[in-house]
Amino acid sequence: MIVKIDGSYGEGGGQILRTSIALSALLGKPVEIINIRAKRTNPGLQPQHLTGVSAAALLTDADIEGAAKGSTRLYFKPKTLKCGTFNIDIGTAGSISLVIQTLAPILLYAPCPTKLVITGGTDVAWAPPIDYMRYVFVKVLSLFGAKIAIELVRRGHYPRGGGRVIVYVEPIKKLRAVHYVEFGRLVKISGISHAVNLPTHVAERQAKAAKETLAKLGYVAEVEVETRSDGLGPGSGIVLWAESDIGNVVGGDALGERGKPAEEVGREAAERLAAVLKTGVSLDPHMADMAVVYMALAEGRSKMSTSEATLHLQTNMYIVEQFLPVKFKLEKTGARYIIEVDGIGYSR
């Protein structure tokens, strides 16, 4: 039975494609997506989307139609789920994090452990930075029982990319439900401020501004300063994350840009993290839209909270409901949004 998805639904971006391909590949259900990225100024598939599609096709021996730059229709029919070692080259500064987002749910149910070596952009606009994936995404997924490790070899920024990341995924039988509406007691705030092919003071100023901004709000943060000179081009950024006594992790990040003061970058990341901490939720807005896939696949009722009901989140819930017999509940309680679903306890 083919699943038909209208790519112009909700936020109408690449997220619809990523979630649809991930669930199609995992469940072995063919999917046809039309009006892909219909609401974007450059509609249709772009190189980084094609990498995610072709990587999912490689892992599942899929038949695909419409996998070309600018295509607004894609047909994807998966066959056998493989595992092992795979090299994926995005070929541009396309986001490595977004490729991981597509492939992680598939590989958790693969027949054996998998190692992915991915080349592309590690810290680019409109995507979670790689340190967010390493320290927030991986830790939140571990609450569901997922075992994923992400190793950063080299950073890659826009426009040249060239970053390299190694991802290890251990297969599991079933994901377990997660029931955390409260963040818990704050244990520590950590961070990494990086600068590549730039003076050390850029990373130092980002870190200092982040720590000072958080200190004014009563938070203490330990931020590691990382400088490298092995990039294909210059770039900088900062990722902060807060951990609680019950294992919840939320993050805030910002990317350096030409002409943007380093202090502003650090302050922006700190303010984003503080805004989430203030609400006492268990998921930051970025993680909430990624978590719904795992909540639906897990065994039992999952209940989590986030600080914003973004269009990304609502769109992702809708896409998951097209593939799985689940119904999400999204309810506003004070400053929080409670996400609840009875997961199907998927197993291969």
Swiss-Prot record:
It catalyses: a 3'-end 3'-phospho-ribonucleotide-RNA + ATP = a 3'-end 2',3'-cyclophospho-ribonucleotide-RNA + AMP + diphosphate. GO terms for molecular function: ATP binding; RNA-3'-phosphate cyclase activity. Its EC number is 6.5.1.4. One of its GO terms (cellular component) is cytoplasm. One of its GO terms (biological process) is RNA processing. It is found in: Cytoplasm. It is an enzyme of class 6 (ligase). This is RNA 3'-terminal phosphate cyclase. ATP binds at Q101, H286, M287, A288, D289. InterPro entries: RNA3'-term_phos_cycl_insert, RNA3'_phos_cyclase_dom, RNA3'_phos_cyclase_dom_sf, RNA3'_term_phos_cyc, RNA3'_term_phos_cyc_type_1, RNA3'_term_phos_cycl-like_CS, RNA3'P_cycl/enolpyr_Trfase_a/b, RPTC_insert. The keyword RNA-binding does not apply. It comes from the Archaea.
